[in-house]
Regions:
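Short coil/turn segments at secondary-structure boundaries
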Residues: 67-68, 121-124, 204-209, 237
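Conserved structural core of kinase catalytic domains
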Residues: 86, 92-129
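Conserved kinase catalytic-core helix
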Residues: 125-155, 159-160
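Juxta-kinase regulatory segment immediately upstream of eukaryotic protein kinase catalytic domains
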Residues: 1-40
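Helical subdomain adjoining the active site within ATP-dependent kinase catalytic cores
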Residues: 208, 217-320, 324
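ATP-binding glycine-rich loop module of kinase domains
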Residues: 47-87
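Catalytic activation segment of kinase domains across protein kinase-like and atypical kinase folds
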Residues: 151, 159-223
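Intrinsically disordered, Lys/Arg-rich low-complexity segments
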Residues: 313-360
Length: 360
């Protein structure tokens, strides 16, 4: 438990957690003095509103809190969302501090993310490195979550549920297996996923979707494994459907190379027929897996290398080259003088024919 979480629980002990505006502080102008109040709303959903408040007087230790109206959302989704987000700590999800069930609302206390929604951030004209980094982080975190919790789906990854905040620039490592990884720059940004109210998670029942009320848009315990991948890439596709510059053209071509355009577009989102239209609820859609997408040269920056070339490269790097053996070539004999050789042979033959004189 962090110091911030510990101090928050001390301040909002018991029923105090049902009235955070009476204890958490916000700045009042013109002098910026910190006083207890609800303050400015940070975001709003169908049944919820999000605010922030500081646990101290200098305004440096803010927390966010999400108030869910239980007179409209009567199924108790707040407790479910808190449990799921708590399980996903370390996967690009805000830290969860506390859940409180009150008379007319559920309240979730969580890490305050000083960031912009993806849709708003996109309008600031970020560079290609930043865009690639955000896309890669979202997809890689989804891949990592599915490795740890195979049954997980977020089901609501539109631009309002992805936050982008500035962070120090550093390298991040994308690991796709024991011997498969690559490094890229984070582009000085971090992507954060929020709002798990429509998600499914192993061994935790979501009361919002358990009655089958969202099956008409493919949201259920049996939804397609690539639901989130498709929804997120379609969210980006809508922004580059008519490329306005070279960066958008590259993103357009990247998504087009992965998903047929008949499965993409504004009408897919507006009509809420993401699954029915493309048929991936029955496994008929041509939707690639996370590994295929993360291995794309759009992210890696390299061309695909054939398995044979990789194998040869590994063999070469592991094999020590021996010193080459030098074979001595015998010296050639001097050319034979045939005339001299014949004279010498005749002399020898005559000597053999001389009579032998014996002494008496």
């Amino acid at each position: 438990m962090t110091n911030l979480e510990s101090n928050l629980k001390k301040i909002l002990r018991g029923k105090k957690a049902c009235t955070p505006g009476n204890f958490l502080k916000v700045p009042f102008w013109p002098y910026g003095k910190m006083k207890p109040a609800k303050g400015k709303m940070l975001g709003q959903g169908q049944y919820s509103k999000v605010y922030r408040g500081s646990i101290n007087d200098n305004g440096r230790r803010y927390v966010a809190y999400k108030e869910i109206d239980t007179s409209k959302n009567t199924v108790g989704s707040g407790a479910f969302e808190y449990k799921v987000a708590k399980q996903l700590k370390g996967y690009g999800v805000p830290d969860q501090y506390m859940y409180k069930k009150c008379e007319s609302m559920d309240i979730l206390y969580l890490e305050h993310i000083k960031a912009k929604e993806f849709d708003i951030w996109w309008k600031t004209n970020p560079g290609m490195e930043e865009i690639k980094s955000v896309m890669l982080q979202v997809l890689y975190n989804l891949y990592r979550i599915k490795q740890e919790f195979p049954g997980f789906r977020h089901h609501d990854l539109h631009g309002g549920n992805i936050l982008v905040r500035p962070v120090p620039t550093k390298e991040i490592v994308i690991r796709l297996g024991e011997n498969q990884s690559y490094k890229v720059s984070n582009g000085g940004v971090e992507a954060v996923m929020i709002d798990f109210g429509l998600s499914v998670f192993p061994r935790i029942t979501n009361p919002v979707i358990s009655n089958g009320g969202y099956e008409y848009v493919g949201i259920s315990k049996k939804s397609h494994p690539q639901y989130d991948l498709h929804t997120f890439l379609n969210t980006v596709w809508i922004k580059v459907i008519r490329p306005k510059n070279e960066n958008e053209r590259k993103i357009h071509e990247f998504i087009k190379s992965l998903i047929p355009t008949k499965y993409l577009g504004v009408m897919v989102m507006k009509k809420q027929t993401i699954i029915r239209r493309i048929g991936i609820d029955e496994g008929k859609g041509d939707i690639p897996g996370f590994k295929t997408v993360l291995n794309h040269s759009f992210f890696t920056g390299e061309k695909k290398v054939s398995k044979l070339n990789k194998l040869l490269k590994n063999i070469t790097s592991k094999t020590k080259l021996k010193k080459p053996m030098v074979i001595a070539v015998p010296n050639k004999k001097s050319p034979v003088n045939q005339k001299a050789a014949l004279t010498r042979a005749v002399t020898i033959m005559k000597a053999k024919q001389k009579p032998i004189i014996r002494r008496k």
